C-alpha cells in the first residue's frame, strides 16, 4: 500500500513536470505570455471562473472585516490592489461602503468584456442579499449592466492607478481605511513585497486594516489539481530560479513565518492569520494539521520545506489580517 501511494505521487509529479515544461516554453517564446493569456481568458473563459469565485468569497471577507477586524465598512475608503481584469472590486467596494474606492494595478484597467457578468454576480451575491447596501446603491449598480468599465469606475467614483510600481504607489499618505488583495503578494520578490508593505503602511490611516489572501500553493496546483500543493518548496533555489523564475510561474516561496516577519518589520499589528485548508476549502484559526491534507507527502523534506512547521505543511493559503496602530 505504501509503495502504491509513492507511485501515485510520482505519477502526479511527472504530470506536473509536463505542464511546467509547456509553460516554460511558452514563457520564453516572443509573444508567448500574451498568447497564453489570450487563450486562457478568451477560449477557456478563465475570467468567468474568477467572477464566480469573487461572488463566493467577498461576502466572507466583508464579515471578517466587520467581525474580526471591527471595521464598520459604511463610508470607508476601500483600496483593492491588483483587482485583475474583471470590474468586480469597484462594484463590491461601492456596495459595501457607499463611497468611491481605489484600485491599483501593474497592468491596465478592468476589461469592458466582463462588466455585465460582474454586475449580475454582485446583485446575486450575499453582499446584496444581506442588505449590505441601500436601494440607491443597488439601483446604481443594476443600471450598469450594459455599461463599459470606464462607466463603472465613474458611477462608483472609483479612482484607479494603472501601470504602477508596487514599491512606489501614487496614493496619498493616510488616505485609505482598508487595503485588500487576493493571490497577489506571492508573486512579488521578497524585496518588492517588503517595499509594498511599507507603502501600504504609509497609505493606510491609523487604525486601518491590511487584508491580504496569500496563496502558498505551487502554481502548478492550479493547472493540475492532483499536483502536491507545496512541492515547489522542495526544489533547491537555483533549480527553481531556472525552471520557474519566469512570469507565468514565479512564486516567492516564502514560509508563513517569513511573510509575518515582513508585516511585523513595517510596524503592523497582527489581527489574525486564517489558514485555508484542503480538501474542505475552509479557513481555520488553528489546528491546520488536523483539519487539512498535507501539501507534500510526509517523506519529502528537501529544499525550503525545512522552514515549514507541521501547521505550514497543511496550509494551502493564509488570509493575513493586520492593523496599522492607532498611534502611528
Language-model features: locations:
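A C-terminal cap/extension of S-adenosyl-L-methionine-dependent methyltransferases
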Residues: 261-264, 270-328
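Class I S-adenosyl-L-methionine-dependent methyltransferase module
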Residues: 95, 99-159
Amino acid at each position: 500500500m505504501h509503495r502504491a501511494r509513492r507511485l501515485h505521487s510520482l505519477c502526479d509529479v511527472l504530470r506536473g513536470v509536463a505542464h511546467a515544461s509547456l509553460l516554460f516554453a511558452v514563457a520564453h517564446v516572443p509573444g508567448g505570455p500574451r498568447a497564453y493569456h489570450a487563450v486562457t481568458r478568451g477560449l477557456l473563459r478563465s475570467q468567468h471562473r474568477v467572477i464566480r469565485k469573487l461572488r463566493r468569497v467577498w461576502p466572507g471577507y466583508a464579515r471578517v472585516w466587520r467581525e474580526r477586524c471591527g471595521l464598520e465598512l459604511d463610508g470607508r475608503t476601500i483600496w483593492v490592489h491588483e483587482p485583475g481584469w474583471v470590474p468586480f472590486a469597484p462594484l463590491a467596494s461601492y456596495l459595501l461602503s457607499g463611497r468611491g474606492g481605489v484600485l491599483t494595478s501593474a497592468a491596465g484597467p478592468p476589461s469592458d468584456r466582463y462588466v455585465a457578468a460582474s454586475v449580475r454576480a454582485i446583485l446575486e451575491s450575499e453582499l446584496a442579499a444581506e442588505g449590505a447596501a441601500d436601494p440607491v446603491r443597488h439601483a446604481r449598480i443594476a443600471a450598469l449592466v450594459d455599461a463599459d468599465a470606464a462607466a463603472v469606475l465613474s458611477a462608483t467614483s472609483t479612482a484607479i492607478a494603472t501601470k504602477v510600481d508596487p514599491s512606489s504607489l501614487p496614493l496619498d499618505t493616510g488616505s485609505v481605511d482598508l487595503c485588500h488583495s487576493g493571490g497577489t503578494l506571492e508573486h512579488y520578490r521578497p524585496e518588492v513585497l517588503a517595499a509594498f508593505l511599507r507603502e501600504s503602511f504609509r497609505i493606510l490611516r491609523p487604525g486601518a486594516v491590511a487584508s491580504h489572501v496569500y496563496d502558498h500553493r505551487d502554481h502548478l496546483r492550479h493547472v493540475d489539481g492532483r499536483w502536491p500543493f507545496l512541492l515547489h518548496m522542495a526544489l533547491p533555489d537555483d533549480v527553481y530560479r531556472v525552471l520557474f523564475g519566469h512570469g507565468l510561474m514565479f512564486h516567492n516561496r516564502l514560509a508563513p513565518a517569513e511573510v509575518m516577519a515582513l508585516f511585523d518589520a513595517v510596524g503592523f499589528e497582527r489581527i489574525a492569520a486564517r489558514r485555508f485548508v484542503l480538501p474542505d476549502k475552509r479557513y481555520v484559526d488553528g489546528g491546520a494539521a488536523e483539519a487539512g491534507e498535507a501539501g507534500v507527502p510526509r517523506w519529502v523534506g528537501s529544499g525550503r520545506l525545512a522552514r515549514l512547521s507541521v501547521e505550514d505543511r497543511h496550509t494551502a493559503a493564509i488570509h493575513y489580517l493586520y492593523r496599522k496602530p492607532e498611534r502611528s
